[in-house]
Amino acid sequence: MFSRLIHIVQSFSKVERLLFYGALVIFIVSGAILAIEATDEYTYKKPLPGGRYSEGFVGQLTAINPILTNNDIDRTISKLLFETLDALSESIKDDGKRVWTVRLKDNVLWHDGEMITSDDVVFTIQTIQNPNAFSPLFTTWQGVVAERVSEKEVRLTIRTPYVFFNDNLKDLPIIPKHIFDHIPPTNLRLSEYSIEAIGSGPYKFDSYQKRKDGFITKYTLALNDHYYGNAPLIHFVDFKFYSSLEDLVVGFNAGEISGFGTFDPRITKEISRSHVVYSLLLPQYYALFLNQNSSLPLKEKNVRLALDYAIDRKRIIDEVFLGHAITVSGPLVPGSSGYSPSVNVPKEYNPTKAHTILESSGWKPNSDHRGIRTRRLGDAIVLLEFTITTPDTPLLVKTAQIIRENLEAVGSKVTLDIVSIDSINKDIIPSRNYQITLFGNITGRQPDFFSFWHSSQRFYPGLNLALYQNKSADNLIESIRQNSDPEKRQSDLTTLQSAIIQDYPVLFLYAPHYIHITEPRIKGFDAKWVLTPAYKFDTIKSWYINTTRALR
Protein backbone atom coordinates (compact mmCIF):
# COMPACT_ATOMS: atom_id res chain seq x y z
CA MET A 1 0.00 0.00 0.00
CA PHE A 2 2.75 2.39 1.02
CA SER A 3 4.95 1.49 -2.00
CA ARG A 4 1.98 2.02 -4.30
CA LEU A 5 1.45 5.50 -2.79
CA ILE A 6 5.11 6.33 -3.41
CA HIS A 7 4.77 5.12 -7.03
CA ILE A 8 1.71 7.34 -7.52
CA VAL A 9 3.51 10.38 -6.09
CA GLN A 10 6.50 9.73 -8.34
CA SER A 11 4.18 9.80 -11.35
CA PHE A 12 3.10 13.37 -10.46
CA SER A 13 4.44 16.34 -12.37
CA LYS A 14 6.68 18.80 -10.49
CA VAL A 15 3.76 21.17 -9.86
CA GLU A 16 1.52 18.30 -8.73
CA ARG A 17 4.22 17.11 -6.28
CA LEU A 18 4.54 20.61 -4.77
CA LEU A 19 0.78 20.82 -4.34
CA PHE A 20 0.68 17.32 -2.81
CA TYR A 21 3.49 17.97 -0.32
CA GLY A 22 1.99 21.35 0.59
CA ALA A 23 -1.37 19.73 1.26
CA LEU A 24 0.36 16.98 3.28
CA VAL A 25 2.17 19.53 5.48
CA ILE A 26 -1.08 21.44 6.05
CA PHE A 27 -2.81 18.16 6.94
CA ILE A 28 -0.11 17.16 9.45
CA VAL A 29 0.09 20.62 11.06
CA SER A 30 -3.72 20.89 11.26
CA GLY A 31 -3.89 17.43 12.78
CA ALA A 32 -1.29 18.34 15.36
CA ILE A 33 -3.13 21.55 16.26
CA LEU A 34 -6.43 19.67 16.55
CA ALA A 35 -4.74 17.05 18.73
CA ILE A 36 -3.31 19.74 21.02
CA GLU A 37 -6.67 21.51 21.22
CA ALA A 38 -8.41 18.22 21.94
CA THR A 39 -5.84 17.44 24.62
CA ASP A 40 -6.38 20.85 26.24
CA GLU A 41 -10.17 20.53 25.95
CA TYR A 42 -10.52 17.02 27.35
CA THR A 43 -7.55 16.84 29.72
CA TYR A 44 -5.78 19.11 32.20
CA LYS A 45 -2.41 19.30 33.90
CA LYS A 46 -2.62 17.64 37.28
CA PRO A 47 -0.03 18.18 40.04
CA LEU A 48 1.93 15.01 40.76
CA PRO A 49 3.64 14.15 44.06
CA GLY A 50 7.41 14.25 44.08
CA GLY A 51 10.29 16.59 43.45
CA ARG A 52 12.66 18.65 45.53
CA TYR A 53 12.58 22.34 46.41
CA SER A 54 15.71 24.20 47.59
CA GLU A 55 15.50 27.54 49.42
CA GLY A 56 18.56 29.78 49.74
CA PHE A 57 19.39 31.83 52.83
CA VAL A 58 22.11 34.29 53.76
CA GLY A 59 23.40 33.35 57.21
CA GLN A 60 23.06 30.35 59.49
CA LEU A 61 20.43 28.50 61.44
CA THR A 62 20.97 28.65 65.20
CA ALA A 63 18.17 26.76 66.95
CA ILE A 64 15.33 24.92 65.23
CA ASN A 65 13.06 25.19 68.23
CA PRO A 66 9.94 27.31 67.64
CA ILE A 67 9.78 28.72 71.16
CA LEU A 68 13.37 29.97 70.86
CA THR A 69 13.51 31.25 67.27
CA ASN A 70 14.51 34.89 66.89
CA ASN A 71 15.48 35.11 63.21
CA ASP A 72 13.82 34.39 59.86
CA ILE A 73 15.96 31.33 59.09
CA ASP A 74 15.05 29.50 62.30
CA ARG A 75 11.42 30.61 62.08
CA THR A 76 11.08 29.40 58.48
CA ILE A 77 12.50 25.92 59.11
CA SER A 78 10.58 25.57 62.39
CA LYS A 79 7.26 26.28 60.65
CA LEU A 80 7.71 23.19 58.47
CA LEU A 81 8.82 20.98 61.37
CA PHE A 82 6.40 22.06 64.12
CA GLU A 83 2.63 22.54 64.14
CA THR A 84 0.74 25.23 66.04
CA LEU A 85 -1.88 24.51 68.66
CA ASP A 86 -4.56 25.56 66.18
CA ALA A 87 -3.47 22.83 63.74
CA LEU A 88 -3.25 20.19 66.48
CA SER A 89 -6.61 21.03 68.09
CA GLU A 90 -10.01 19.55 67.50
CA SER A 91 -11.57 22.55 69.27
CA ILE A 92 -10.64 25.74 71.13
CA LYS A 93 -13.42 27.18 73.28
CA ASP A 94 -13.59 30.08 75.73
CA ASP A 95 -16.02 31.32 78.35
CA GLY A 96 -16.01 34.81 76.86
CA LYS A 97 -13.79 36.16 79.61
CA ARG A 98 -10.67 34.50 80.98
CA VAL A 99 -10.80 30.71 80.52
CA TRP A 100 -10.01 28.67 77.39
CA THR A 101 -10.41 24.92 76.94
CA VAL A 102 -8.43 23.15 74.23
CA ARG A 103 -9.23 19.67 72.94
CA LEU A 104 -6.45 17.99 70.94
CA LYS A 105 -7.05 15.82 67.89
CA ASP A 106 -6.80 12.06 68.34
CA ASN A 107 -3.91 10.01 66.94
CA VAL A 108 -1.62 12.93 66.15
CA LEU A 109 2.02 11.87 66.46
CA TRP A 110 5.45 13.37 66.84
CA HIS A 111 7.99 12.55 64.13
CA ASP A 112 9.38 9.73 66.32
CA GLY A 113 5.95 8.10 66.61
CA GLU A 114 5.11 9.26 70.15
CA MET A 115 1.57 10.53 70.80
CA ILE A 116 0.97 14.28 71.22
CA THR A 117 -0.86 14.93 74.49
CA SER A 118 -1.95 17.75 76.75
CA ASP A 119 1.32 17.29 78.68
CA ASP A 120 3.16 18.66 75.65
CA VAL A 121 0.97 21.78 75.60
CA VAL A 122 1.43 22.48 79.32
CA PHE A 123 5.17 21.81 79.06
CA THR A 124 5.52 24.19 76.10
CA ILE A 125 3.83 27.07 77.92
CA GLN A 126 5.71 26.50 81.17
CA THR A 127 9.03 26.36 79.31
CA ILE A 128 8.25 29.66 77.57
CA GLN A 129 7.43 31.17 80.98
CA ASN A 130 10.76 30.03 82.44
CA PRO A 131 13.11 33.06 82.29
CA ASN A 132 16.10 30.71 81.97
CA ALA A 133 14.84 29.56 78.57
CA PHE A 134 15.15 33.10 77.16
CA SER A 135 12.17 32.58 74.88
CA PRO A 136 11.13 35.54 72.67
CA LEU A 137 7.56 34.55 73.61
CA PHE A 138 8.21 35.09 77.34
CA THR A 139 6.31 38.39 77.67
CA THR A 140 3.32 37.16 75.64
CA TRP A 141 2.72 34.20 77.96
CA GLN A 142 3.23 35.80 81.36
CA GLY A 143 0.21 35.45 83.63
CA VAL A 144 -1.22 32.44 81.76
CA VAL A 145 -1.97 29.33 83.84
CA ALA A 146 -1.99 26.06 81.87
CA GLU A 147 -3.55 22.96 83.46
CA ARG A 148 -3.88 19.39 82.26
CA VAL A 149 -7.53 18.29 82.36
CA SER A 150 -7.07 14.95 80.60
CA GLU A 151 -4.71 13.34 78.11
CA LYS A 152 -6.26 15.37 75.30
CA GLU A 153 -7.64 18.41 77.10
CA VAL A 154 -6.01 21.56 78.51
CA ARG A 155 -7.47 24.48 80.44
CA LEU A 156 -5.85 27.92 80.19
CA THR A 157 -6.67 30.85 82.45
CA ILE A 158 -5.54 34.47 82.05
CA ARG A 159 -5.50 37.14 84.75
CA THR A 160 -7.51 39.80 82.93
CA PRO A 161 -9.70 39.71 79.82
CA TYR A 162 -7.65 39.98 76.63
CA VAL A 163 -9.48 39.77 73.31
CA PHE A 164 -6.38 38.87 71.30
CA PHE A 165 -5.42 35.90 73.48
CA ASN A 166 -7.26 33.52 71.18
CA ASP A 167 -4.84 34.40 68.37
CA ASN A 168 -1.84 33.92 70.64
CA LEU A 169 -3.23 30.52 71.57
CA LYS A 170 -3.79 29.42 67.98
CA ASP A 171 -0.31 30.57 66.94
CA LEU A 172 1.45 28.76 69.80
CA PRO A 173 3.94 26.17 68.44
CA ILE A 174 4.04 22.98 70.51
CA ILE A 175 7.27 21.16 71.41
CA PRO A 176 7.61 17.54 72.68
CA LYS A 177 7.91 17.12 76.43
CA HIS A 178 9.50 13.67 76.16
CA ILE A 179 12.39 15.18 74.19
CA PHE A 180 13.08 18.38 76.16
CA ASP A 181 11.86 17.56 79.68
CA HIS A 182 15.27 16.45 80.95
CA ILE A 183 17.25 19.28 79.33
CA PRO A 184 17.89 22.35 81.53
CA PRO A 185 16.15 25.42 80.04
CA THR A 186 19.49 27.23 79.74
CA ASN A 187 20.78 24.42 77.50
CA LEU A 188 17.82 24.18 75.11
CA ARG A 189 19.63 26.05 72.35
CA LEU A 190 22.68 23.80 72.76
CA SER A 191 20.72 20.56 72.55
CA GLU A 192 21.25 18.33 69.50
CA TYR A 193 17.47 18.45 69.12
CA SER A 194 17.75 22.12 68.22
CA ILE A 195 19.38 20.90 65.01
CA GLU A 196 18.04 17.36 64.59
CA ALA A 197 14.55 18.53 65.49
CA ILE A 198 11.62 16.26 66.32
CA GLY A 199 8.33 17.99 65.66
CA SER A 200 4.85 17.28 64.31
CA GLY A 201 4.78 19.26 61.06
CA PRO A 202 4.34 18.04 57.48
CA TYR A 203 8.12 17.66 57.11
CA LYS A 204 10.67 15.95 59.36
CA PHE A 205 14.40 16.37 59.78
CA ASP A 206 16.39 14.28 57.30
CA SER A 207 20.04 15.39 57.29
CA TYR A 208 22.46 18.29 57.27
CA GLN A 209 25.91 19.02 55.90
CA LYS A 210 28.56 21.31 57.32
CA ARG A 211 32.09 22.44 56.54
CA LYS A 212 35.08 21.74 58.77
CA ASP A 213 34.73 25.23 60.25
CA GLY A 214 31.22 24.35 61.46
CA PHE A 215 29.30 26.39 58.87
CA ILE A 216 26.16 24.44 57.96
CA THR A 217 25.84 24.48 54.18
CA LYS A 218 22.68 22.40 53.74
CA TYR A 219 19.74 21.30 55.88
CA THR A 220 17.28 18.80 54.42
CA LEU A 221 13.68 17.95 55.32
CA ALA A 222 11.68 14.96 54.10
CA LEU A 223 7.95 14.27 54.13
CA ASN A 224 6.64 13.23 57.55
CA ASP A 225 5.25 9.70 57.19
CA HIS A 226 3.35 10.14 60.49
CA TYR A 227 1.60 13.34 59.35
CA TYR A 228 -2.09 13.44 60.24
CA GLY A 229 -3.20 15.97 57.61
CA ASN A 230 -3.00 16.42 53.86
CA ALA A 231 0.64 15.93 52.93
CA PRO A 232 2.50 18.39 50.67
CA LEU A 233 3.20 17.27 47.11
CA ILE A 234 6.91 18.14 47.20
CA HIS A 235 8.82 15.30 48.87
CA PHE A 236 12.01 17.06 49.96
CA VAL A 237 12.89 20.61 51.00
CA ASP A 238 16.53 21.70 51.17
CA PHE A 239 17.76 24.87 52.85
CA LYS A 240 21.12 26.02 51.55
CA PHE A 241 23.15 28.67 53.33
CA TYR A 242 25.43 31.33 51.86
CA SER A 243 27.80 33.87 53.37
CA SER A 244 26.44 36.81 51.36
CA LEU A 245 23.55 37.83 49.15
CA GLU A 246 25.95 37.99 46.22
CA ASP A 247 26.97 34.35 46.77
CA LEU A 248 23.31 33.37 47.05
CA VAL A 249 22.46 34.98 43.71
CA VAL A 250 25.43 33.23 42.10
CA GLY A 251 24.03 29.99 43.51
CA PHE A 252 20.58 30.71 42.10
CA ASN A 253 22.02 31.55 38.68
CA ALA A 254 23.97 28.26 38.78
CA GLY A 255 20.84 26.24 39.59
CA GLU A 256 21.95 25.34 43.13
CA ILE A 257 18.67 26.56 44.64
CA SER A 258 15.06 26.78 43.46
CA GLY A 259 14.20 30.06 45.15
CA PHE A 260 14.92 32.63 47.83
CA GLY A 261 13.43 35.70 49.49
CA THR A 262 14.65 39.25 49.98
CA PHE A 263 13.49 42.75 50.84
CA ASP A 264 15.93 44.16 48.27
CA PRO A 265 14.27 44.14 44.82
CA ARG A 266 17.44 45.55 43.26
CA ILE A 267 18.92 42.05 43.45
CA THR A 268 16.61 40.94 40.62
CA LYS A 269 18.88 42.86 38.24
CA GLU A 270 21.67 40.39 39.06
CA ILE A 271 19.64 37.30 38.14
CA SER A 272 20.62 35.81 34.78
CA ARG A 273 18.33 32.78 34.58
CA SER A 274 14.59 32.50 34.04
CA HIS A 275 12.66 33.30 37.22
CA VAL A 276 9.33 34.44 38.66
CA VAL A 277 9.01 37.35 41.12
CA TYR A 278 6.25 37.49 43.75
CA SER A 279 5.80 40.75 45.69
CA LEU A 280 4.18 40.11 49.09
CA LEU A 281 2.79 42.62 51.58
CA LEU A 282 3.52 42.23 55.30
CA PRO A 283 2.18 43.98 58.44
CA GLN A 284 5.51 45.73 58.81
CA TYR A 285 6.47 49.37 58.40
CA TYR A 286 9.53 51.58 58.76
CA ALA A 287 9.53 55.01 60.34
CA LEU A 288 11.64 57.67 61.98
CA PHE A 289 11.11 57.26 65.73
CA LEU A 290 11.67 60.61 67.45
CA ASN A 291 13.17 60.73 70.94
CA GLN A 292 11.93 64.12 72.14
CA ASN A 293 13.85 63.73 75.42
CA SER A 294 17.17 64.00 73.59
CA SER A 295 16.44 66.93 71.26
CA LEU A 296 14.99 70.37 72.03
CA PRO A 297 13.75 70.99 68.45
CA LEU A 298 11.90 67.64 68.39
CA LYS A 299 9.86 68.69 71.43
CA GLU A 300 8.05 71.18 69.17
CA LYS A 301 5.15 69.67 67.28
CA ASN A 302 5.52 72.20 64.45
CA VAL A 303 9.10 71.05 63.88
CA ARG A 304 7.95 67.43 63.71
CA LEU A 305 5.17 68.45 61.31
CA ALA A 306 7.60 70.35 59.08
CA LEU A 307 10.00 67.40 58.94
CA ASP A 308 7.10 65.18 57.92
CA TYR A 309 6.27 67.45 54.97
CA ALA A 310 9.95 67.57 53.97
CA ILE A 311 10.34 63.82 53.34
CA ASP A 312 9.92 62.56 49.78
CA ARG A 313 8.51 59.08 50.39
CA LYS A 314 7.78 58.43 46.71
CA ARG A 315 11.43 58.98 45.87
CA ILE A 316 12.46 56.50 48.57
CA ILE A 317 10.05 53.88 47.24
CA ASP A 318 11.09 54.44 43.61
CA GLU A 319 14.85 54.66 44.12
CA VAL A 320 15.42 52.27 47.02
CA PHE A 321 12.66 49.71 46.50
CA LEU A 322 12.02 50.04 42.74
CA GLY A 323 8.33 50.46 43.52
CA HIS A 324 8.10 47.34 45.73
CA ALA A 325 6.76 49.23 48.77
CA ILE A 326 3.82 51.41 49.77
CA THR A 327 3.66 54.62 51.78
CA VAL A 328 2.43 54.36 55.35
CA SER A 329 0.57 57.16 57.12
CA GLY A 330 -0.02 55.66 60.55
CA PRO A 331 0.70 52.80 62.97
CA LEU A 332 -1.04 50.13 60.85
CA VAL A 333 -0.21 48.96 57.35
CA PRO A 334 -3.05 49.20 54.79
CA GLY A 335 -4.89 45.90 54.69
CA SER A 336 -4.10 45.06 58.32
CA SER A 337 -6.84 44.15 60.76
CA GLY A 338 -8.20 47.34 62.34
CA TYR A 339 -6.75 49.68 59.72
CA SER A 340 -8.85 52.86 59.35
CA PRO A 341 -8.59 54.46 55.87
CA SER A 342 -10.52 57.54 56.99
CA VAL A 343 -7.73 58.77 59.28
CA ASN A 344 -4.73 57.43 57.37
CA VAL A 345 -4.51 60.29 54.89
CA PRO A 346 -1.64 59.83 52.38
CA LYS A 347 1.49 61.75 53.35
CA GLU A 348 2.16 64.90 51.32
CA TYR A 349 5.63 65.82 50.12
CA ASN A 350 5.63 69.61 50.34
CA PRO A 351 9.00 71.22 51.16
CA THR A 352 7.48 74.68 50.59
CA LYS A 353 4.98 74.05 53.38
CA ALA A 354 7.82 72.73 55.56
CA HIS A 355 9.74 76.01 55.02
CA THR A 356 6.62 78.05 55.87
CA ILE A 357 5.93 76.13 59.10
CA LEU A 358 9.52 76.50 60.29
CA GLU A 359 9.61 80.21 59.45
CA SER A 360 6.34 80.91 61.25
CA SER A 361 7.61 78.95 64.28
CA GLY A 362 10.68 81.15 64.60
CA TRP A 363 13.25 78.85 63.02
CA LYS A 364 15.26 81.21 60.77
CA PRO A 365 18.27 80.55 58.53
CA ASN A 366 21.40 81.70 60.39
CA SER A 367 24.36 82.91 58.31
CA ASP A 368 26.67 82.29 61.28
CA HIS A 369 25.82 78.61 61.02
CA ARG A 370 26.05 78.14 57.24
CA GLY A 371 22.37 78.84 56.74
CA ILE A 372 21.16 76.21 59.19
CA ARG A 373 17.97 77.30 60.90
CA THR A 374 18.23 78.41 64.52
CA ARG A 375 15.90 79.70 67.19
CA ARG A 376 16.45 81.35 70.53
CA LEU A 377 15.11 79.21 73.35
CA GLY A 378 15.68 81.00 76.65
CA ASP A 379 19.29 82.21 76.71
CA ALA A 380 20.48 79.70 74.13
CA ILE A 381 20.61 79.72 70.35
CA VAL A 382 19.43 76.26 69.32
CA LEU A 383 20.32 74.76 65.95
CA LEU A 384 17.84 72.75 63.95
CA GLU A 385 20.09 69.72 63.88
CA PHE A 386 19.51 66.00 64.34
CA THR A 387 21.34 62.70 64.36
CA ILE A 388 19.60 59.79 62.65
CA THR A 389 20.74 56.37 63.88
CA THR A 390 20.18 53.53 61.44
CA PRO A 391 21.25 49.88 61.12
CA ASP A 392 24.04 49.22 58.65
CA THR A 393 21.93 47.60 55.94
CA PRO A 394 21.99 48.87 52.33
CA LEU A 395 18.26 49.63 52.08
CA LEU A 396 18.10 51.58 55.35
CA VAL A 397 21.35 53.44 54.71
CA LYS A 398 20.12 54.54 51.27
CA THR A 399 16.78 55.57 52.81
CA ALA A 400 18.57 57.58 55.51
CA GLN A 401 20.72 59.33 52.89
CA ILE A 402 17.64 60.48 50.97
CA ILE A 403 15.99 61.67 54.19
CA ARG A 404 19.12 63.60 55.17
CA GLU A 405 19.05 65.32 51.78
CA ASN A 406 15.33 66.13 52.22
CA LEU A 407 15.72 67.57 55.72
CA GLU A 408 18.82 69.58 54.90
CA ALA A 409 16.93 71.11 51.96
CA VAL A 410 14.58 72.81 54.44
CA GLY A 411 17.38 74.21 56.60
CA SER A 412 18.32 71.54 59.12
CA LYS A 413 21.64 69.84 59.75
CA VAL A 414 21.52 66.03 59.75
CA THR A 415 24.20 63.57 60.82
CA LEU A 416 23.88 59.87 60.03
CA ASP A 417 25.00 57.42 62.70
CA ILE A 418 25.27 54.06 60.93
CA VAL A 419 25.76 51.17 63.35
CA SER A 420 25.69 47.38 63.21
CA ILE A 421 22.40 45.53 63.60
CA ASP A 422 23.85 43.84 66.67
CA SER A 423 24.62 47.22 68.25
CA ILE A 424 21.13 48.53 67.43
CA ASN A 425 19.43 45.53 69.04
CA LYS A 426 21.68 45.14 72.07
CA ASP A 427 22.70 48.72 72.90
CA ILE A 428 20.93 51.54 71.05
CA ILE A 429 17.31 50.38 71.30
CA PRO A 430 17.45 49.10 74.92
CA SER A 431 19.10 52.32 76.15
CA ARG A 432 17.00 54.60 73.89
CA ASN A 433 20.30 56.28 73.06
CA TYR A 434 19.25 58.13 69.91
CA GLN A 435 17.64 61.37 68.78
CA ILE A 436 15.99 59.80 65.74
CA THR A 437 16.20 56.16 64.75
CA LEU A 438 15.21 54.67 61.42
CA PHE A 439 13.71 51.36 62.41
CA GLY A 440 10.87 48.95 61.67
CA ASN A 441 7.85 47.59 63.51
CA ILE A 442 6.11 44.29 62.82
CA THR A 443 2.56 44.92 63.98
CA GLY A 444 1.38 41.31 63.87
CA ARG A 445 -1.89 39.63 63.09
CA GLN A 446 -4.08 41.71 65.41
CA PRO A 447 -3.97 45.46 66.20
CA ASP A 448 -2.62 45.25 69.74
CA PHE A 449 -0.87 48.60 70.21
CA PHE A 450 0.29 47.97 73.77
CA SER A 451 3.98 47.10 73.24
CA PHE A 452 4.53 49.85 70.67
CA TRP A 453 2.47 52.78 71.96
CA HIS A 454 1.47 52.40 75.64
CA SER A 455 3.38 54.79 77.91
CA SER A 456 4.35 51.91 80.23
CA GLN A 457 6.41 50.48 77.38
CA ARG A 458 8.62 53.55 76.86
CA PHE A 459 11.67 51.82 78.26
CA TYR A 460 13.28 48.44 77.66
CA PRO A 461 12.02 45.75 77.21
CA GLY A 462 9.06 47.76 75.89
CA LEU A 463 8.97 48.69 72.20
CA ASN A 464 7.62 52.23 72.48
CA LEU A 465 10.61 53.59 70.57
CA ALA A 466 9.20 57.13 70.34
CA LEU A 467 8.73 57.22 74.15
CA TYR A 468 5.17 58.24 73.34
CA GLN A 469 3.02 59.47 76.25
CA ASN A 470 -0.68 60.19 75.88
CA LYS A 471 -3.12 59.29 78.66
CA SER A 472 -6.08 59.16 76.28
CA ALA A 473 -4.13 56.83 73.99
CA ASP A 474 -3.26 54.60 76.96
CA ASN A 475 -6.95 54.34 77.88
CA LEU A 476 -7.89 53.47 74.30
CA ILE A 477 -5.18 50.80 74.10
CA GLU A 478 -6.42 49.20 77.31
CA SER A 479 -10.03 49.34 76.13
CA ILE A 480 -9.16 47.75 72.77
CA ARG A 481 -7.40 44.85 74.52
CA GLN A 482 -10.38 44.05 76.74
CA ASN A 483 -13.49 44.99 74.76
CA SER A 484 -15.14 42.01 73.06
CA ASP A 485 -17.56 44.21 71.07
CA PRO A 486 -16.01 44.42 67.56
CA GLU A 487 -17.79 47.69 66.66
CA LYS A 488 -16.65 49.45 69.83
CA ARG A 489 -13.15 48.05 69.38
CA GLN A 490 -12.94 49.34 65.80
CA SER A 491 -14.24 52.74 66.88
CA ASP A 492 -11.51 52.92 69.53
CA LEU A 493 -8.91 51.79 66.99
CA THR A 494 -9.90 54.59 64.63
CA THR A 495 -9.70 57.17 67.42
CA LEU A 496 -6.35 55.79 68.56
CA GLN A 497 -4.83 55.85 65.07
CA SER A 498 -6.01 59.43 64.64
CA ALA A 499 -4.46 60.48 67.97
CA ILE A 500 -1.07 58.95 67.15
CA ILE A 501 -1.02 60.42 63.65
CA GLN A 502 -1.93 63.92 64.87
CA ASP A 503 0.68 63.91 67.67
CA TYR A 504 3.56 63.21 65.25
CA PRO A 505 5.69 61.15 67.67
CA VAL A 506 6.87 59.21 64.63
CA LEU A 507 7.38 60.08 60.97
CA PHE A 508 5.86 57.11 59.17
CA LEU A 509 7.59 56.19 55.92
CA TYR A 510 6.84 52.97 54.05
CA ALA A 511 5.94 49.29 54.18
CA PRO A 512 8.35 47.25 52.05
CA HIS A 513 7.19 44.26 50.06
CA TYR A 514 8.84 40.92 50.65
CA ILE A 515 10.17 39.60 47.34
CA HIS A 516 9.91 35.83 46.76
CA ILE A 517 11.85 34.60 43.72
CA THR A 518 11.60 31.09 42.25
CA GLU A 519 12.29 29.04 39.18
CA PRO A 520 9.31 28.95 36.78
CA ARG A 521 8.97 25.18 37.32
CA ILE A 522 7.80 25.74 40.91
CA LYS A 523 4.01 25.99 40.61
CA GLY A 524 1.16 26.64 43.02
CA PHE A 525 2.58 29.57 44.99
CA ASP A 526 -0.38 31.90 45.53
CA ALA A 527 0.40 33.97 48.65
CA LYS A 528 -0.27 37.72 48.44
CA TRP A 529 0.12 38.69 52.11
CA VAL A 530 2.30 37.07 54.79
CA LEU A 531 2.66 37.76 58.50
CA THR A 532 6.45 37.33 58.33
CA PRO A 533 8.74 35.95 55.60
CA ALA A 534 8.53 32.50 57.22
CA TYR A 535 4.78 32.42 56.55
CA LYS A 536 5.26 32.06 52.80
CA PHE A 537 5.71 28.35 53.51
CA ASP A 538 2.16 28.19 54.91
CA THR A 539 1.05 27.51 51.34
CA ILE A 540 3.61 24.78 50.60
CA LYS A 541 0.92 22.09 50.47
CA SER A 542 -0.27 23.66 47.21
CA TRP A 543 3.22 23.90 45.68
CA TYR A 544 4.20 21.34 43.06
CA ILE A 545 6.90 20.57 40.52
CA ASN A 546 5.83 17.42 38.66
CA THR A 547 2.64 17.17 36.57
CA THR A 548 0.69 14.64 34.55
CA ARG A 549 -2.38 14.92 32.32
CA ALA A 550 -5.79 13.68 33.42
CA LEU A 551 -9.23 13.60 31.80
CA ARG A 552 -11.53 16.46 32.71
What are these regions (language model features)?
Residues 218-222, 299-405, 495, 549:
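Append "and occasionally in soluble cytosolic enzymes with long acidic Gly/Pro-rich linkers
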Residues 26, 214-217, 364-443, 514:
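Ligand/substrate-recognition segments at binding pockets and active sites
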Residues 172-236, 246, 351-360, 545-552:
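Gly/Pro-rich hinge or "lid" segments in bacterial periplasmic/extracellular proteins
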Residues 91-134, 155-157, 251, 297-299:
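Aromatic- and charge-enriched surface segment that lines or borders ligand/interaction sites
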Residues 224-270, 404, 413-415:
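Ligand-site clamp/hinge motif
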